Amino acid sequence: MNILILDDEMLARQELTFLIQQSKELDHPDIFEAEDISSAEKILFRQQIDLIFLDISLSEENGFTLANQLEQLAHPPLVVFATAYDHYAVKAFESNAADYILKPFEQGRVDKALAKVKKIQHLSTIDETATTEKKGMELLTLTLADRSIVLKMPDIVAASIEDGELTVSTKNTSYTIKKTLNWFKTRAKTNYFLQIHRNTVVNLEMIQEIQPWFNHTLLLVMVNGEKFPVGRSYMKELNAHLTL
């Protein structure tokens, strides 16, 4: 498991690193440390992080800022808030945190948080394995100002966010609604949809052409003529799906 600890206090990072390494819940975890959000973002760009221990009251920053950004990742890590203050607990769990632990850290409490994370990951794996794909029956309803549109999921070419609005496109048309990309992703639970940029999810079966792009990335040309650049942090997963 890859774990990131974000805390502006070096001693707190060292203490939590030690307790995680001592825990019997994990076998040789890889632990990364960051003292601010910028450093954490760089690690998230380079590594697939499974779990973040996230302090809330950072010097001149707030841990919720990073927590809100994680939804844009292809595979968001689980979050355990690790802070000295208990009054953030409600907001933390509203942010879908896996757990919330208080300083000073205790081995037993860290073990409990890690066990909870493992259980969440296990249940998620079971759910994905048990899901039988029914491409012809999957539908997406888009509520417009004057009517609702029902689309078959396999007919969708892409979904992208721009200026806070979600555009869902098909071969012949597109629809723009006030939804988030995460809203679409939770409804596109099939292996032919893949996030290729923080703003874009595409239907892999609707890719018509792949072109080289800037900084050793790619540009996807879809069957309807739309073109989408692939973000650098999404290249590895795209290559795996397309066996490039």
Curated annotation (Swiss-Prot):
InterPro entries xref list: CheY-like_superfamily (IPR011006), LytR-like (IPR046947), LytTR_DNA-bd_dom (IPR007492), Sig_transdc_resp-reg_receiver (IPR001789)
Annotated Response regulatory domain residues: 2-118
SMART domains linked: LytTR, REC
Disulfide bonds, paired cysteine numbers: none
Principal cellular location given in the protein's record: cytoplasm
The entry's keywords: Cytoplasm, DNA-binding, Phosphoprotein, Transcription, Transcription regulation, Two-component regulatory system
SUPFAM superfamilies, sorted: CheY-like
Domain of life the protein comes from: Bacteria
Record localization: Cytoplasm
A Pfam entry, by short name: Response_reg
Modification after translation: Phosphorylated by LytS.
Domain HTH LytTR-type, chain residue ranges per copy: 140-244
Keyword Translocase included in the entry's annotation: no
GO MF term (any one): DNA binding
One GO CC term on file: cytoplasm
Residues recorded with modification 4-aspartylphosphate: 55
Function statement: Member of the two-component regulatory system LytR/LytS that probably regulates genes involved in cell wall metabolism.
Name by which UniProt lists this protein: Sensory transduction protein LytR
Annotated source species: Streptococcus mutans serotype c (strain ATCC 700610 / UA159)
Gene name tied to this protein: lytR
